[in-house]
Amino acid sequence: MIDRRHFIAGSLAASLPAGATRVLAQSAAASAEASEHRLASYADAMNFERLPPEVVTAVKRLVIDTLACAFGAVGAEPAKIADQTFRAAYAGPAVATVIGQKGLSSVEGATLVNGVLVRYLDLNDIYAGGDPAHPSECIPAAIACCEEAGRSGRDLITAIAIGYETQLALVDAVGFSSRGFHSVSCAGFVTPLIAGKLWGMTRAQMAYGMGISGPKQMTLLAINSGPISMVKALVYPQGAADGVFAARMARNGFTGAAGVLEWFVQRTKGRTSEFVLDLRPDRFRILNVGLKRFPLQFELQTIAEAGVELHHGLKGRLDGVKEILVETSARAKEATASPSRYEPKTKETADHSLPICLALALIEGDVTVEHFEHDRWKSPDVFALARKVRVEVAPSSVGVERGSVESFVKVTLASGESLEKRIALPDGDPRRPMSEAALTSKFMQFVEPVLGKSQAARLLDTCHRLETIRDVHELTLLLAPA
């Protein structure tokens, strides 16, 4: 039988001038080197034995932190809406665990709902690279796909490492925000690799999976403009669920586009017109990922910490505060101290508001999930103190590349006395890592109320020895209440 595509291609090549034939050949070669194929080759070649011990440890710490964030959001309205809507609209084999719930969902359903749980509190990890990113958003897809396939803890660690490294390489290479797009656009490229690796797909199938979901997942930065809504917690999980479905399509023979990211970089105006994807097998960006102490935007971590440090010196004297001066980076001022941030209307905007978060820290001596979930941020005393906050760009931050998060806070009283605090790096920054005790405390704080002390402790132990478990169900069975 004649291969129709080869017949047409051969006939066309024969009828074209020599120059045009060369162009066709070059185009085919370029397709083979397209980003989808390079990413798929990286994922296919990666295995547990190639991961250095410090990377394995980093993955386990990130799983612990991510599960803490997810359990902290169990019962939150956005997650309930997502779960109810998905179950009503889509059917699928019930094979994957929804965190904090009895009963199973489809892989895509668990990816979506668990993803919303992970992101909702704004407490999950942070990478301050070419664009800020929260790479732990890929972990729900990895757990769900691993659970469906019945793979091991080592397989899960490898898939998560692939998810992190490919996503962080993309945010460094593309510069999404400079083009008016959000870094969550990576979801459509990352999750087909995670699913493909766990499901034993070929490189070509993984590349097609990215070519199916990637072009649809370009997300406008408008989601972070003005008042922030629940959609902040949905965009990556939605893209991840679609990426998992795209991997299924590709595994069954559906083909996808190639060179999507190259086209995107060339056709949109951003910080670079070149697409240089650095995916060296010996470079692990996961080691540059930080954890969060406070449920706030990344740029607010040092500001909140400074406020907490100043709290004790202001006890009983807050009524006498005349002005609060904050010096921070230009990006932090633009993102967290615009006029709308002084009068937030939603929880999602409040935890991205410098004046509100600093006021909470100064008044309460901490900034917690409860302050947002129980509407403490809306209180008149918080708004009154927030109005006294003046934000300036720190001279030391001018020209400094992204990742500089130093903040200076000076509180001046009506008496003329002033108190000040400078924080160079936030607790949890890779250059100031969160301690094991602090990470354990964060985990137990959020997991114990859902699972109970005994099961929470067993889940934590399972995470610490993740590379030793033969079946990931040993982990996932502990994610739901007994």
Segments the model singles out, each with a brief description of its role:
Residues 136-143, 187-194, 240-245, 300-304, ...:
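Well-ordered alpha-helical segments within folded domains of soluble proteins
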Residues 2-131, 224, 228-241, 248-482:
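Terminal-appendage/accessory-domain detector
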Residues 125-165:
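Hydrophobic alpha-helical hairpins/lids featuring a short glycine-rich hinge
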Residues 107-122, 135-140, 161-170:
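A short glycine/small-residue-enriched secondary-structure motif
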